[in-house]
């Protein structure tokens, strides 16, 4: 059962850096719905993309799966035999709850839920890979290598879904969308103290890129096509496609 996020409603003397610990895992569904505009749409559309891209006898990877929302959306939309979903997260608290969520919904497609580092996972025989608000928590210097590995592990015609919080090269636009996002959180019941404390904890851990930077990395990895398919304020999602005739 998810609880309402009140983690930062009182002043915290020493904030430290953000971690996906048991306290965060307990309130995560409420937190992300109230903090990430368009999150529910992205999750449901990931399922629609899965219906289009997942092929028989292949694997789907959910890298940084948290509580398994994207995994469940994908699994609901797989209608082929001999497919498997591999869901990975490095947070023990998230993985424990993810396993409970996956087990609560029965479906023919098996799911391997793995506690581990996505940088160490081999990507093989993949028709679809999901990075849903995950890449932004890696060191920027490590992001290209992960995208390279994903491209190599995708089958021809496969797709990567990359959802992120964005920064903007146009400072005026960036300021507007930053403020709109804060308005969104206020409208969802977060106080100025909650917004400020969470931002302070995240600022050294979540380092955002522009859409242009993401597209450049995807192109360097080998993806022939990539495009922003969803955006709400400074959050959005790209889809990158490996050509059907790729070697």
UniProtKB/Swiss-Prot annotation:
Q: Which Pfam families match?
A: Methyltransf_25 (PF13649)
Biological process GO terms, please? tRNA wobble uridine modification
State the Gene Ontology terms under molecular function: carboxyl- or carbamoyltransferase activity; S-adenosyl-L-methionine binding
The entry marks the following residues as binding S-adenosyl-L-methionine, namely 39, 64-66, 89-90, 117-118, 132, 199
Quote the catalytic activity from the record: prephenate + S-adenosyl-L-methionine = carboxy-S-adenosyl-L-methionine + 3-phenylpyruvate + H2O
| Record keywords, A-Z | S-adenosyl-L-methionine, Transferase
Read off the InterPro entries from this record.
CmoA (IPR005271), Methyltransf_25 (IPR041698), SAM-dependent_MTases_sf (IPR029063)
Instruction: Give the enzyme's EC designation.
Output: 2.1.3.-
Return the CDD domains for the record. Answer: AdoMet_MTases (cd02440)
The top EC class, named as a word, is transferase
Q: Which ranges form a coiled coil? A: none
Q: What is the top-level taxon of the source organism?
A: Bacteria
User: What family does this chain come from, according to its entry?
Assistant: Belongs to the class I-like SAM-binding methyltransferase superfamily. Cx-SAM synthase family.
Say what the protein does: Catalyzes the conversion of S-adenosyl-L-methionine (SAM) to carboxy-S-adenosyl-L-methionine (Cx-SAM).
Q: How does it assemble?
A: Homodimer.
Q: What is this protein called?
A: Carboxy-S-adenosyl-L-methionine synthase
Which organism does this sequence originate in? Escherichia coli O7:K1 (strain IAI39 / ExPEC)
């Amino acid at each position: 059962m998810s609880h309402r996020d009140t983690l930062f409603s009182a002043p915290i003397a020493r904030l430290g850096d953000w971690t996906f610990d048991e306290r965060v895992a307990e309130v995560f569904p409420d937190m992300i719905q109230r903090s990430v505009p368009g999150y529910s749409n992205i999750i449901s559309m990931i399922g629609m993309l899965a219906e289009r891209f997942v092929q028989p006898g292949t694997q789907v990877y959910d890298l940084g799966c948290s509580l398994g929302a994207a995994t469940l959306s994908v699994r609901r939309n797989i209608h082929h035999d001999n497919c498997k979903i591999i869901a990975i997260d490095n947070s023990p608290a998230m993985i424990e709850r993810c396993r409970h969520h996956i087990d609560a919904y029965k479906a023919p497609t098996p799911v391997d839920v793995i506690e581990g580092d996505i940088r160490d996972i081999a990507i093989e025989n993949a028709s679809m890979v999901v990075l849903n608000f995950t890449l932004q928590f890696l060191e920027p210097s490590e992001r290209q290598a992960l995208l390279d590995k994903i491209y190599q592990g995708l089958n021809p015609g496969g797709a990567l879904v990359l959802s992120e919080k964005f920064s903007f090269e146009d400072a005026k636009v960036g300021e507007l969308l930053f403020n709109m996002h804060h308005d969104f959180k206020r409208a969802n019941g977060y106080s100025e103290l909650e917004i400020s404390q969470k931002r302070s904890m995240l600022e050294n851990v979540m380092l955002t890129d522009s859409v242009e930077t993401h597209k450049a990395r995807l192109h360097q990895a080998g993806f022939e096509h990539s495009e922003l398919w969803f955006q709400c304020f400074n959050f959005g999602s790209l889809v990158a496609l490996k050509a059907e005739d790729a070697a």
